[in-house]
Amino acid sequence: EVPDLFFFLPSNPQYKVWAGLGVLLPLDDLVKDTKYVKEIFESDQYKTTTVNGEHYFVPLISMQNSHAIYYRKDWLDKLGMEEPKTLDEFESMLKAFTENDPDGNGQNDTYGISLSKVSGWLSSLYSTFGVRPGWNKAGDKYEAYYMTDEYKNMLAWLADMYSEGYIQKEYFLNTDQQKLENFYAGKAGLTFANSGSSVDGIVSKVKEANQNAEVDVL
């Protein structure tokens, strides 16, 4: 006994075996009178998932980015700055978090961004630079997103931020937990982390270290 519907990744070739055995129902006749799904079935990207010219599943619409940029709003207020709306304003915030003593302790001991060696968190910056995750059509070819000019521009910008000292120098040694601990402890004014249900937990951890701290999300 098998379920009527199930989730499956097209990268797993098992579905082709099941389709060949007649276990799966081809969906082409069921969607021929639709507009949106039929267009997907006929797209170039979807042709590689057919078995003998027939389709056996529809794509799942999922959220590309569930990450958020957390920052110390109390630091921004203390420095007399508004929430950044442009990349230039974002850079100005990082500079101020690094150079203008936002925690008020009279020491040069803060920096703009706390990162880890896991690069996936950078997806929060993708839209700023026009990066589209996955494979992008370039003429008659497809190009992985990390090979695009947009992604390279993002890396070049991050390299500039690193050379300016706005990113922790040893970030590549950090685990994700260490990245967060630096933010909790007030060493950095900004970090990347999960959104949704994670927000309350991150805010409470920051307030454990400093009850007057305020955290907001970009």
Predicted regions and their residues:
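Extracytoplasmic/secretory soluble proteins
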Residues: E1-L218
